[in-house]
Amino acid sequence: MINVITGRQVDNLQNEIIDQAVKSYYQDKTHDVFIIVPNHIKFTTEVRALSKLSVLTNKKQVAVNKLHILSFSRLAWYFLKDEAIKLPQILDDAASVMLLEQIVKDHQDELKLFQNKNQITSGALRQMYEAILSVRAGNIDLENIDNEKLNEETSYKVHDLQIIYDDFIDRLSEKFATKDEMQLLLNEFLAKSDSLSTMVFYFSDFSHFSLQELTSVRLISKKAKNTTLAFKTKIGKIDSKAEQGDYDYVVQRTIRQLEHFWQNQQLNYQTTEFPLTKTNPSSLLNGVWTKTNGFDESLSKFLQPVKADSRYAEAYFVARTIYQQVALNNYRYQDFLVLAPNLNEYETYLTPILRQNNIPFFNDLQKEMKYHPLVVAVENLQQIFKRGFQTDNVIALMKTQLFIPEWYKSVARYQNDVDLLENFVLAHGIKGELWKKPLKSFVDAEVIALDKSEQEVEELDRLRKYFISILSEFFEDIETEKDPQAGVTIFWNFLIKNRVAKRLEAWRKEANDAGDLQLAQQPEQVWSTLNDLLKDYLLVAKEFSLEQFFDLLISGFSEANFSQIPSTLDAVNISEMGMVQGQGYKQVFIIGATSSNLPQIEKIPGFFSSENLEQLNDGNNASGYLEDQQKINNLDQNYQFGNALSLASDKIYISYPVINTANEQLEPSIFYKQLLRLTQANEFSQHDLPSSAGDLLTFMTNPEASLGYLTYLKGKQEVNVDSILELTEQEIGEVAQNVLEGSNFKNVPENLPPKLAQELYGDRIETSVSQLETYYQNSFEYFLNYGLHLKKRFENELDVIQAGNYYHETFDYLVKKIKEKNLDFADLTDSKLNQLLIEVREELKEKGRYRQLLNDPFNKYLFHKLDQTTSNVAHYWHSNVNKTTFRPQYSELSFGKNQKVTGLSYSWKDENNQKKIVDLRGKMDRVDLAKVNDRVLGEVIDYKSSAKKFDLGLFANGISMQMISYLEVLKKNNKFFAQGKNLDVLGAFYQNITSSLERLSSDKMILSNYQIKDLLKESTKKLMYNGILVADEEILDLIEPGMEKDRATSEIYSSIKRKVNGDISWPRNQSFTPDQLELLLAYNSYLIKNAGSEILSGKIKLDPYTYGQQSSLTYSDFKDIFFFDAMLKENNYHKIKAIDKKTLLNLIKEKLDLDGDE
C-alpha cells in the first residue's frame, strides 16, 4: 500500500512518520521498518525514534535490529553489504577529475571546446565531471539527442561530452566507480529484488529527490509491503496544477512525478491530509508568509526583527538571548536553532561568543581538512617541487611540527630554533640553492646579532642540514620514478621514516588525554583520508607523475571534511539555511539576512547552462532527462525560507548587520522587509555597545562576558553600575579588577623615573644628529629604538635604505680611489671615470651584505639600475668640475669620539646640579675644499636618493638639524680642514642621486611660446646642489668663477643667478648672512641640549609630528606598539607649520632670549 501524507510547513509530519513507523515495528518485530530521511538529520531522527519506542515499551533503554533510520546513501550500503556482488572501489572526486584530464588530453584533437591546453583547467574539468554524473543519473543517451534542436554552443558541448563520457565510462567499468555508483547499484538491486515485499518504508522531510533517489522511491513504492511518504505543501494539499513560480512548485512537482509513475504502473495509493492543528503563532506566520491568512496582532510578539550594528553585535544578540532564556525562562539549550545563509561569515564571531558565555553548541558546518598540518605539509612539498627551496615553503614545512628531528627533546626548543632559523635566512636572503650552503658562509655580512654567535649558528645549521638532506633525498628518489606503485611507496616511506605517523598519533593521544574527543579524531581521519587518496591515485594513474600526484592529494584534501559528533545532546544547534532541519525547536534565529544572502540565488553555471539543459531535454528522444539543479534551487527559495520560519514554536528572530567587516553598508534582505511589513513587528536595534542603563539588560549574560560592557558604562558618568560591578567582582575578583583598571588606561606613555633613566642612559649619551631628530619626530619612538633597542626583524631586501647605502659607498670608494691614485677629478677622461666606477662596484659587490643581495636575479637588475644612476651623477660632477674650484677632499668622514674630526659636545647641570653631557657623532658624506688666494673654502655634500630641500619649519622643530650640525662641525674643526687658516664655509647641500628625466608632458617643459625646453638640460637641474648657503657674493665668485659674468645663472647651485643690476639673487629661504648663520648654529645647539636634557631626565611623549602630508608615523616600525589614535583625547599630533626665514629668525631670538636686528 502506498500512502501520501500532506501537511503544511508548520505541521510536525516527521513526528507523525516516526509515530507510525515505531508502532508498525512494535506491533510486528518480524518485518523490517525503514525511516528514510535526509542525511543531515539522520542522527536526531534516530534519537527521537528510539525515545518514542522507549516510551511505548516503557523501558529506559531499548535495542532494535529491525527498525532502521537511514539516509539514501546508508540505505544503499545496507542492502548491498550482503549481496553476492563485488562492490567497486569508489573514486574520490579528485581522482575522477584526474582520470578525466587524461581522457581530455587523449582526445584533444577530436574536441571542439578543449583544443587549447589552457582551456583544460581544474574548474572546467570539475564542471564536466558533474555534467557526466548528471547525464548518468538522468539516464541520458547522448547519441539520441536531436542536434537540430540545439544551438551551436550546446551542440559543441554535447559533441565533446559524448566523446569524453564514453571513454570515461569505459575506463570505469568493472574496476572502480564514481561517488554516485552506490545509488545506481541500489536501484539495480531494487529492480531485481524480491525481498522488499515484507518491508515497510517511511519517507520524511523531503521536498525534492535527485533523479536516482526518485527512481529508488518509485521502485520501493512498487515492491514494498507499505510505503508512506510525507510532504509539506503550501496549504497541506496536493495541487496538480502547480506551475513554475508558485510557492510550493518544487514539492508539488515531486508529488506529481510519483503520482504519474503510480498511475502508469496501476498502483493503488491514497492521500491523507494532515488534520489542521489549533491556531498558533507559527501557523499564523506561515499563513501570512504564504499569503493564505491575513495579519494577526500576535505576530508582532512571535517575530522579532533585529537590526544589528555589526556581525559581532548580531552574534552577541543570539548568545545573550539564549543565555537569558535558559537562565530565566526554563529553556534548554537544545530548544534553540541558529541558521545563517552563509555561516562562514560568522566563523570568527558566533562560536567564540557562545564559548565566552559557556553555551554548549553543535556547529554542523563541516570543518575543512585543508588546514590540517599534514595537508599544509603536502602543499609545501608540492611548492618545493615546483619552485625549489623557497624560504616560505621550507619554513612552513618546518612549522607543521611533523618532521621534528630526533635530537630535540621538546617541541618548544624545536620551535624556538625554527624561529631563529627563519630570522637568519630572511636576514641573509637565503632561498633556492642557497639553502644547501652552510650558514657560516653568510655570517660575514653581520646583519643580525646571530652572525656573531658561532655556537647558535652551528645548531641552526644542523637543523637546516637535516631538512635539506631529507627533502633532497626524497625528491631525488621520486622525481624520476615512472611506476605509480613505486612512486606512492617512496612518498609513504618518506612519511613513515620521518615519523609523521608517530607524530599524528602523539597528537591524538594528547587531545584524548585532555578530553577533547573531537580534536582527537582529526589525526586519524586525516591519515585515513591520505590512505584513500593514495589508493585512488593507484587506481587511475597509468604512469607516475609527481605533479599530478600532488595535484590529486591537494584537490582531494580540499574537498575533505572532518566528521563531527555532538559532545552533548543538550546543545544549541548551528546550521545553514537550505539544509533540512528536524522540528521541535522552540526558538529559532535567522542571522545574516542581508540582500546579498537571502534569497540564496545561485548564479554560477555548470558545464551546461540552464538554456543548454532546456534544449537538451527538448531534443532528447528517450525517457531520461537532465535536471537543472540551479534552477530548482532558485525556484524553491520562498518555500525553503518558509520551512525555516516554521521551525519555531515560541519565537522567531531574524537579523541583519548594517555593515560588514570592510565597513561597507549592507541592506536587509527582501524577505526581512516583507516580514517587517506583513507582521508589523517592531524592529529591535542591537548596538555594539550599551549607551545607557536602559540598554544594560540587552548585554548582560555571565560575569566574564558582561564585564566589558559594565566597565564601558562605568566610564559614562550618567550611568551607575557600581552595584552590579560589585557582584561581578565577587564572582571573578582578580579578572574584574584588571579589566576595571584597564578601563582607566590612557594611551599616554609614562616618563621614566630619574633612577631608571640614569640606569638606561647614564649621565652622558653619545648619539647622532639623526637619532636626536627621531626624538623630536616622536620621543616615544626614540625611547623604543635607542633606549630599549627594539628593532623590526631584518630582512635581506634591496630596499630604499640598502639602495641609499650603496649610493653612499659607491661615491665614498670613488672619491677615495681618486685620492689614492693621486688623480685630479678635472683631468679624468670619461672612459677613465667609467673604469674607476667599475673597480668600485666590483669591490663593493664582494662585500657580504651586497653579495647576498646579488643572489637574487631581480636584485642584479636593480643593482644595474643603481649603477646607471651613480654613473649619471658621477658624470654630472665630472662635467661641472672645471666650473668650480671645489674638489672632493673627504668622503664618509666620521666625526666624534676617537675620530680625527672632533664631534659636538654639550654639557649642562640638571635640577639636582648633576652634570649631563651629550656627545654628537656622525659621518659626513663628502667634504669639498678649495684653496683660493690664500683662503680655504669649504662645503658639505649630503647624498639623498630623493629630492630634498632645507625646510625651515622642520629645522625650527628639531626635525632637520643635520645640515646645520655639519656646518658647526666644519667651523669647530677649522684646524683640521684649513691647517690653521680660517675656513670660510659656503654651505651644506643635498645632492639628489637620480637618473630620472623630466616628463615631456610636464608644465615645466613648455615655454610661453609653446616650444619644448631642452630635455637633458631641464633634467640636469635635478642634480644641482640644494640646501643651506651663506649669502656671500665674494665667496661665491671664488667658488664658481662663471658667476662673475653679467646675468649669469649658477650651473652648480640651485636658484642662484646674477640680476640685471649686478646683484646676486639668492634663494629666499635657504640663504643666510654670516650673522644669521651664527643664530642658526646657536639655535641648533639649543635644540641638541634640550633633546639631551629631556632624554636623560626620562621624558617620553607620544607626539608624532605632521607636516602637510608628512607624518612620522608613515614609515614607523612601531605603530603596533604606539596604538596612536587621533580620535582619542590624549593622542594628538604635533602639527608643524611652514615658516619663512624672517619668522624663523624671530623665533630663534625669542627662544634664545636675544634682542637686536638680524
From Swiss-Prot:
InterPro entries on file: ADDB_N, DNA_helicase_suRexB, P-loop_NTPase, PDDEXK_AddAB-type
Keyword entries, A-Z: ATP-binding, DNA damage, DNA repair, DNA-binding, Exonuclease, Helicase, Hydrolase, Nuclease, Nucleotide-binding
Cofactors: Mg(2+)
Domain of life assignment: Bacteria
GO BP term (any one): double-strand break repair via homologous recombination
Coiled coil feature spans: none
Annotated GO MF terms: 5'-3' exonuclease activity; ATP binding; double-stranded DNA binding; helicase activity; hydrolase activity, acting on acid anhydrides
EC number: 3.1.-.-
Assembly behavior: Heterodimer of AddA and RexB.
Note: Despite having helicase-like domains, this subunit does not have helicase activity.
Family per similarity comment: Belongs to the helicase family. AddB/RexB type 2 subfamily.
PANTHER family registered for this protein in UniProt: RECBCD ENZYME SUBUNIT RECC
Protein's job: The heterodimer acts as both an ATP-dependent DNA helicase and an ATP-dependent, dual-direction single-stranded exonuclease. Recognizes the chi site generating a DNA molecule suitable for the initiation of homologous recombination. This subunit has 5' -> 3' nuclease activity but not helicase activity.
Protein known as: ATP-dependent helicase/deoxyribonuclease subunit B
This protein's encoding gene: rexB
